[in-house]
Amino acid sequence: MGGGSIVPPLGLATNASYIPDRYDVMIVDENVKQAIYSDADLVAVTTNTITARRAYSLCKEFREKGIPIVLGGIHPSVMPEEAGRYADAVVIGNGENVWEELLGDFERGRLKKVYRPETFDLTQSAVPRRDLLKGRYFYDSLQTSRGCPFDCEFCSVTRLYGGEYKYKPLDRIRKELESLRTRNVLLVDDNILGVGKEAERRALKLFELLGEYGLHWIGQASINIADNSEALRLAQESGAKAFYIGFESLNEDFLRAANKRQNLKKGVSSYKDVIKKIHDHGIAVLASFIYGTDFDTRDSLLRLVDFISESTIDAASVKPLTPFPGTRLYERLKQEGRLFNDHYWLEDPYPLFTFNPKKLSLQELTEATLNFLDIYNPLNSTGYFMRSYQSTQSMRASFIAFLVNISDNRTYRKYIRRHEHTLARRFGIDQWRRQKHREVDIVIHQK
């Protein structure tokens, strides 16, 4: 926090658009600067699980100053009792249609402990208050739909949106497009194409609309987008430069257990073909993978390292499987008594691992983490750029992938260094192995 951010906090800007004009509203993005302790009458904080401990600390500081606190976001929505210990009011779910009631209660001095607004109608969505975003961002952000048609065990989107997949009308999206402050845009929709003929027709119309504004955009998609050549063509023509795609694993047993059915339908053997089809339309592939599952072995993780290195993926994000509260994965591991800490997000620092996989020792899991450091080596980022350009023939798409690699590089290494002493104590490691390149030289001695 206090460092920088690539995209602005769209949720805060969206909620601000529903606050009456009689209020002076300030948005503070802690990814850009620390919170300002001013003479605010009311403070609303949004948080996910990773930032929950910091959010609770903020709540304590504001409440000590006598300023009422409202907590919202995905973590308070799935852990309202916990969040309620730190806030005067907790908003569960979408916040757009809660502000009239909440502010009325605030003015009467009778804030409720919990607000559960009805499902918000996206056809009534307002244009986010981007004028309140004071940070400098490389990308603007835009949401055209909510929810995801899939229900993966490790994902909390279905819990938050109730399995619904809803769209904003195109005329509403047009108004938002006209309010953007840059042509570089991140579409934060969980799945830009969706599933089924209706969803696909809607996506094609969306791409045509985006094409009117000369954008360079990044979106999130499932591997099924590779089967729709028309969608890829229109996406390319509308300015798509990269897709985040959750490949997740090379192990189909894990994909089956996690209900990642969209990947199972095509099969792991299709991954390289999916990548090629997207590349053929000048779009980079920003792939995400998960490790530390109950189906992983030391050998399978080495194969994953080889696959990422040998495939034509433009950028790879490899993270340990984390059971976020609100997911079926969290509930299952908690019931099985396998979580190291049921409230691990309150630990300082935020833990690297939260449970022990069935087929990996903690020593092997740690070694795998170090192996993935090679993927994030700065020298490899340069190689990825050259490979990306050869695959996409798009300088901008390759540059975007390069920036993602550099950002992940910094984040991943900082994360590892933050945990070096904790890892040494927990896993009894005598010494981290040296990495191929000298700038990665972390040595830890057993205590």
Language-model features: locations:
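Acidic, low-complexity intrinsically disordered segments
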Residues: 1-184
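A structural motif corresponding to the C-terminal end of an alpha-helix
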Residues: 18-26, 213, 274-285, 311, ...
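Radical SAM enzyme core and accessory elements
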Residues: 21-27, 106, 338, 351-447
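Short, electropositive alpha-helical surface patch
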Residues: 41-44, 49, 202-208, 296-313, ...
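Structural detector of well-ordered beta-strand residues that form the stable sheet scaffold
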Residues: 70-71, 91, 113-115, 218, ...
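Flexible glycine/acidic-rich beta-alpha junction loops that bind and position SAM and/or redox cofactors
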Residues: 82, 196-197, 253-258, 291-299, ...
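Structural recognition of alpha->loop->beta junctions
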Residues: 82-101, 234-243, 303-318
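Radical SAM [4Fe-4S] cluster-binding motif and immediate context
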Residues: 126-286, 291-293, 299, 306
